[in-house]
């Protein structure tokens, strides 16, 4: 059963991803990076214990990427488990506890950070 999400939680999630004040815009007016951040906001609204992100910084500019990294670090401090998939190890190296490298669907390297 999903939690009831109120306006307070929605506005807080939008603020966490840098979309504060944009809640009344139609989604079609959002840039690709804004849509990426909206998806991240939707993921964190229900306060799940596990978050899975696939290429989360792909459509974000440098400031948006840093904002996402800050958000991930905050979520980690709150005890959340986070799984990040990325083609760019440098993007996740500084925020990961453990990295698995895969090739052709197989784990070829595993290391703790």
Enumerate the predicted regions with their spans.
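Helix N-cap at the start of a conserved alpha-helix in ABC-type nucleotide-binding domains
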Residues: 62-63
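Conserved ABC ATPase "signature" region
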Residues: 5-22
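Catalytic Walker B motif of ABC-type/P-loop ATPase nucleotide-binding domains
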Residues: 51-54
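Conserved catalytic motifs of ABC-family nucleotide-binding domains
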Residues: 47
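Hydrophobic anchor residue at the start of the ABC signature
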Residues: 40
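Short loop immediately C-terminal to the Walker-B catalytic DE motif
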Residues: 57-58
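H-loop/switch region of ABC-family ATPase nucleotide-binding domains
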Residues: 86-87
